[in-house]
């Protein structure tokens, strides 16, 4: 067992440490004694900025609010106590409380006439989640231990039915909903108090360092210690097992199983995917179910290998857009005719204006010739479908796109293709590399989700030059085109169209949704 010396200066327990304990006791111990600086992804950074924007927006609805100042949490806590005692302030922003080795800060705190307090937590989600309630229960516990009475607890969150009217101004009354969660928080307070005491004790117990990795390492967010912990993992760790539930994972951990090679294929309760996964890693070869080839050949030419690129933002920007509604900004298509000819086409928009009308019109024009769509994930068509209501003038174009039959390649391969290097969650790039040996382009400026988000953010900035925006649009289109090319390569290889592939490769490429197709039922073991 590894040992660690305890921290010389005792840290107070806060929201971050409590969340770490809920995720993994090993993470809790390491975060307490050996915290590491997290590499924030572009998506998390944007979410953080959006959260700050939404917080300021929500605070604007509370009159006579005062920001609690203080360079340290102790100074802020002292200032909070003074303002509450004075009784002249209606709302406090960023109020701080310290008690029993714990510290919390509230988004918005409202003082009632009798001196009791209402807690308001601002969230960017569109519904009240369990972890919101746990966070609020922790706040209520510390506030009451600091000598105050909590009167009510509320969550302010985004109304998913809100339709933006355009521009950058938002009305808190229309965008934000309020939920009274006082009773729900009261019910879980005893359990949260017990967890808090247990977590505080756990920081003094280094036995947590022997805990194995698991699905909790990446849920709800990736653990900052995962890169180091994964060095001790076997080649096929248990957390990469498909269809793995927390209950089954806990059961296997109790049996001392952390390596898929330890699992028996005949073990009861294993799903079809799990059995096939064990077979492919033990046989060290790809297993392809017969229906995969059949499905890939049961197509309608021309085939449009289509990549639809979208981004999702909490706060809508364009007319009729709703919170968290996906926004399409690019598409790329490799169209294959029955004779083997391939044409390339695409569209990308990089500016502050609404990309949706031109996106819909350009893609509809490309698909007007008929044929079938081959997509990595058909959920992208739901993004197109969501345009019907806000883009009344473009409904005909949108219906042209949705009228095309389609095949969801990810769903097909997850149910019928098993490869030793494709465990757990599969992406298009990882699948193309494992099956076709294709590496995703990394030499260009836009090559993954984070770089896409950075590019879109930069393009929407007013000060960005026109020439820079043109380059960003070209990079976004190139990124989408690489995704479409991977789809075509996968189809050719898995449908055994080698001759067609060779013929198409010899010819230079020319530059230039519909009812969901049902897959065959998952095979059942004899």
Language-model segments: residues:
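Long, highly charged low-complexity segments
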Residues: 257-315
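Metal-dependent nuclease catalytic cores that hydrolyze phosphodiester bonds in DNA/RNA
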Residues: 1-116, 246-274, 278-280
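Acidic, Mg2+-coordinating catalytic module of metal-dependent nucleases/exonucleases
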Residues: 166-235, 246, 255, 431-505
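Conserved DEDDh/DEDDy metal-dependent 3′-5′ exonuclease domain
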Residues: 90-94, 99, 103-107, 119-122, ...
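Acidic, low-complexity intrinsically disordered tails
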Residues: 500-526
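Terminal, non-catalytic protein-protein interaction segments that mediate quaternary/complex assembly
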Residues: 240-261, 265-274, 342-371, 380-388, ...
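Conserved RNase H-like, two-metal-ion catalytic cores of nucleic-acid enzymes
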Residues: 97, 291-366
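Short helix/loop capping segments that flank catalytic or ligand/cofactor-binding pockets
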Residues: 30, 232-233, 250-252, 261, ...
């Amino acid at each position: 067992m590894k040992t660690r010396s305890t921290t010389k200066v005792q840290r107070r327990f806060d929201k971050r440490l409590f969340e770490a304990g809920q995720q993994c006791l090993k993470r809790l111990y390491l975060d307490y004694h050996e915290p590491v600086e997290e590499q924030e992804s572009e998506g998390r950074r944007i979410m953080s900025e959006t959260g700050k924007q939404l917080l300021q927006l929500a605070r604007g609805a509370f009159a006579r609010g005062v920001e609690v100042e203080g360079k340290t949490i102790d100074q802020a806590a002292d200032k909070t106590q003074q303002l509450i005692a004075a009784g002249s302030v209606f709302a406090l922003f960023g109020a701080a409380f310290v008690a029993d080795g714990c510290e919390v800060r509230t988004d918005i705190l409202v003082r009632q006439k009798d001196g009791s307090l209402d807690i308001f937590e601002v969230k960017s989600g569109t519904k009240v989640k369990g972890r919101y309630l746990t966070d609020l229960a922790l706040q209520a516990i510390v506030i009451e231990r600091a000598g105050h009475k909590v009167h009510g607890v509320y969550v302010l969150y985004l109304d998913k039915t809100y339709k933006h009217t355009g521009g950058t101004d938002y009305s808190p009354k229309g965008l934000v909903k309020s939920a009274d969660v006082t009773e729900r928080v009261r019910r879980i307070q005893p359990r949260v108090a017990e967890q808090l005491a247990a977590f505080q004790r756990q920081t003094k117990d280094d036995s947590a360092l022997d805990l194995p990795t698991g699905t909790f390492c990446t849920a709800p967010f990736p653990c900052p210690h995962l890169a180091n912990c994964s060095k001790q993992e076997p080649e096929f760790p248990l957390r990469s097992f498909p269809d793995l539930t927390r209950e089954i994972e806990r059961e296997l951990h109790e049996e001392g199983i952390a390596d898929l090679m330890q699992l028996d294929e005949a073990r009861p309760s294993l799903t079809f995917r799990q059995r096939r996964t064990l077979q492919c890693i033990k046989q060290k070869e790809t297993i392809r179910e017969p229906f995969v080839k059949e499905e890939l050949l049961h197509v309608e030419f021309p085939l449009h290998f289509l990549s639809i690129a979208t981004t999702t933002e909490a706060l809508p920007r364009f007319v009729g857009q709703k919170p968290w509604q996906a926004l399409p900004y690019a598409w790329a298509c490799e169209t294959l005719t029955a004779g083997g000819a391939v044409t390339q086409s695409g569209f990308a928009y990089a500016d502050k204006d609404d990309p949706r009308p031109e996106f819909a019109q350009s893609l509809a024009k490309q698909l007007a010739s008929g044929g079938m769509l081959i997509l990595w994930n058909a959920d992208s068509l739901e993004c197109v479908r969501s345009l019907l209501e806000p883009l009344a003038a473009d409904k005909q174009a949108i219906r042209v796109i949705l009228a095309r039959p389609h095949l969801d390649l990810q769903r097909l391969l997850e149910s019928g293709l098993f490869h030793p290097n494709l465990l757990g969650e599969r992406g298009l790039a990882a699948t193309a590399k494992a099956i076709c040996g294709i590496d995703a382009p990394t030499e260009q400026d836009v090559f993954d989700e984070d770089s896409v988000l950075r590019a879109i953010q930069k393009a929407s900035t007013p000060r960005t030059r026109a020439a820079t925006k043109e380059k960003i649009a070209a990079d976004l289109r190139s990124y989408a085109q690489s995704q479409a090319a991977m789809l075509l390569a996968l189809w050719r290889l898995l449908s055994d169209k080698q001759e067609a592939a060779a013929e198409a490769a010899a010819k230079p490429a020319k530059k230039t949704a519909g009812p969901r197709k049902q897959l065959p039922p998952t095979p059942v073991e004899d």
